[in-house]
Amino acid sequence: MKVIGITGTKGKTTSALMTAHILNKSGIPAGYIGTSGINYAGRTYPTVNTTPESLELQRIMREMADSGIRAVVMEVSSQGLYLGRVRGIDFDTVCFTNFSPDHIGGAEHPTLEHYAACKRKLFTDYGARCAVYNADDKMAEYMVGDFKGKRRISFSSSDAAANYLLTAAVPERSGCRLGVMGTVLHDGREYTADLPMPGAFNLMNALCAAGAAESLGVPADRSFAALADVTAAGRFQTVDALPGSGITFIVDYAHNGLALESALTVLRKYRPRRLICLFGSVGGRTELRRRELGEVASQLADFCILTSDNPDFEAPEKIIADIAASFKPGASCDYVRIPDRTEAVRYAVSIAREGDIVLLAGKGAEDFQLVNGVRVPYSDRDALLECAKATV
């Protein structure tokens, strides 16, 4: 069974889901392991960690192999590498999406350097045969510079020498649906990548996926054709909650300042009447993340709804207050505080009008809220559909 490992600060989930989608549509039965759970042979179930603990991971991979899966695409988190969860796995291909400050402090990484060094291990310590990497990222050379495998596949939006070069990205909007069409140069030939999800960064994820698929023998034309109907639950996922209303609802996992900035900047390109952002932040983590989320949303959204995320043992009101401290009267957008996330979603549905884009950020495809150490059933998508149904 071939094993593809994908690491990076952002884009792991979407790139991995895209890669598995391409392989499955190309006649290579593939499984997925990552933040969105475990998926193979028509089976889907959740996992606690992005990269499961060692014994659990080995059990899952054994089940996949016994079910006829020929390739597994796995998100490899920095914590997974730090704690040795993937030790003993023989990776065929390893991929690097990008790097930015995150997961520093608390129970995660003590320093940025430690965070980077853990990710780098995927390229130096696991004997992979091929490395696929984002040549635009300033940490690319650090990550893959000492890679000893036989093959490297690069992707870029600026480096003409890259194996996959994104030369154009055009936003597309049809009703409540958002997409993006890209032009890609590969091996002297031009390809079109037409994705049913917004954002040039998703085109970069698509290039990562195409490179990973190529490492297993899938040609580029087949990869880009397969991506025309790809979906990634909770990753810039359009939810048609109010059909015919002209309102676009997006559920996305953006949970730090950089990811939220990227999401809101992309959505601005679709020229919404108003850009409404509903978000919170997790408990038990650095307050820097809360400040960054507030700073970004207060400047890039037209209206914000501050609510709970996974508060755990912290009071949601305290987390919301930390976020709200970044909103400056006269210099920021207006906002409301609604600690109950379901009620916050209900409010978002009630104020949305034709032409608006409403972003529910932070939880993505998660099916729970972590409250006082307990996973309470909750889904942004389900809450959105239920609240919308009640308004009809």
Which residues are covered by each model-predicted region?
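Phosphate-binding loop of NTP-binding sites
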Residues: 1-135, 139-150, 207, 271
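Extended acidic/charged loop-beta regions that coordinate divalent cations
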Residues: 63-65, 69-104, 141-192, 225, ...
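Short glycine-rich anion-binding loops that position phosphate/pyrophosphate groups of nucleotides
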Residues: 78-79, 100-102, 137-138, 171, ...
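Charged helix-capping and loop-helix junction motifs
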Residues: 113-117, 287-297, 320-323, 376-380
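Nucleotide phosphate-binding/pyrophosphate-handling subdomain across enzymes
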Residues: 186-303, 325
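C-terminal helical cap/extension that packs against the catalytic core
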Residues: 246, 294-354
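Short, flexible loop segments at boundaries between secondary-structure elements
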Residues: 378-392
